[in-house]
Amino acid sequence: MNMIREQVNGELYIYTALSDHIVRSPDVCGGRPTFKYTRIEIAGALDRLAHGESMESIVDGYGGRITREALLQAIDVAARHLLANLPDLAA
């Protein structure tokens, strides 16, 4: 994957895009996936969702720094990763 370099509000961001709203950066959160332009890890938001919290509550809980669309993309990225890394059952 290609690293993207962009200047936003005077700050340089270097990351790999996993989707429009989900990125990985070696300098942010140990390279774990985050919501773009934040240090909010998708794992935390997905954990809250898995424990029954509504999307609206999660978005509100992050003070509007993420959107419902971004949360849906986090679900998609996680699902694609899971399916791409399933072990072979023929062993």
Task: Annotate each PLM feature.
Residues 1-40, 79, 83-91:
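Acidic, low-complexity/disordered tracts enriched in E/D and polar residues
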Residues 38-91:
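Long, charge-rich, low-complexity alpha-helical segments
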